[in-house]
């Protein structure tokens, strides 16, 4: 099966997951592109406060991811967890234009990143569960491609909307609510939980299992850690 044929015959739910990622990334990146200006110019935050907000937000997302995969396997309710994660993120979007203090922005970012941490593992597991083994590469590639499209559309929309709204940043931030709601709607209506997950197997989280991980795993983890430490904040 060639790449074109494989992509055309991917399950409808995989396309729905991809569109969910596209819409949510459009919403998130629209906000993130304007957030430093909003914090420092509109709310009068310092560079230190901006760094604190972003540091707490990203740390929250990474820590939450550690447990979301285990929870997804244990409960076998991947769609429910994904909806919870995307739903929480969508619920935070109105908080940004409503914010009149740095504390409210921090709360919004904190909850938004919890949502991101919750949804990542069950969403990717859903892609694998919904797709035949020979199509999984194409399925993951499609979802990530649509995610990247959303990450591009968000900042582009911010530029256009700031121009059209005469630099009224609060009005522009309200527009981010629309794609966030679309993301949750597509996920709820377009994805069904695979039937075989109903007969799930419990997957206890045990520290002793770490000893079973081979050197190749730790090499990848080590490389990822180094690159992450070297990454600059996008704020």
Where are these regions (language model features)?
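Juxtamembrane intracellular "pre-TM" segments in multi-pass secondary transporters
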Residues: 1-12, 193-223
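Helix-loop boundary and gating motifs at the non-cytosolic
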Residues: 5-61, 216-235
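Transmembrane alpha-helix termini and helix-breaking/packing motifs in multi-pass membrane transporters
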Residues: 37-42, 153-173
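Residue-level signature of mid-helix packing/kink "hotspots" within the transmembrane helices
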Residues: 58-66, 151-152
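Helix-to-loop junctions at the C-terminal end of transmembrane segments
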Residues: 64-77, 162
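Structural signature of the two symmetry-related core transmembrane helices
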Residues: 80-95, 177
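Cytoplasmic helix-loop-helix junction between adjacent transmembrane helices
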Residues: 108-149
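C-terminal membrane-cytosol helix-exit motif in multi-pass small-molecule transporters
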Residues: 177-197
């Amino acid at each position: 099966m060639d790449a074109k044929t494989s992509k055309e015959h991917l399950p409808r739910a995989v396309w729905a997951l991809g569109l969910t990622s596209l819409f949510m990334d459009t919403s998130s990146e629209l906000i993130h592109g304007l957030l430093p200006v909003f914090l420092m110019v509109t709310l009068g935050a310092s560079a230190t406060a901006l760094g604190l907000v972003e540091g707490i937000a990203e740390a929250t997302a990474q820590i939450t991811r550690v447990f979301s995969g285990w929870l997804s396997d244990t409960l076998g309710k991947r769609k429910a967890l994904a909806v919870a994660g995307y739903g929480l993120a969508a619920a935070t979007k109105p908080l940004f234009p409503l914010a009149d203090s740095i504390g409210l922005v921090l709360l919004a970012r904190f909850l938004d990143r919890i949502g991101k941490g919750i949804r990542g593992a069950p969403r990717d597991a859903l892609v694998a569960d919904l797709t035949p083994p020979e199509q999984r590469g194409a399925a993951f590639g499609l979802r990530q491609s649509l995610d990247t499209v959303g990450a591009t559309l968000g900042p582009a929309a911010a530029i256009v909307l700031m121009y059209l709204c005469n630099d009224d940043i609060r009005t522009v931030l309200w527009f981010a609510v629309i794609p966030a709601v679309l993301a949750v709607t597509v996920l709820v209506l377009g994805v069904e939980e695979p039937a075989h997950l109903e007969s799930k197997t419990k997957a206890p989280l045990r520290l002793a299992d770490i000893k079973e991980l081979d050197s190749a795993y730790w090499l990848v983890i080590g490389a990822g850690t180094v690159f992450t430490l070297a990454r600059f904040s996008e704020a």
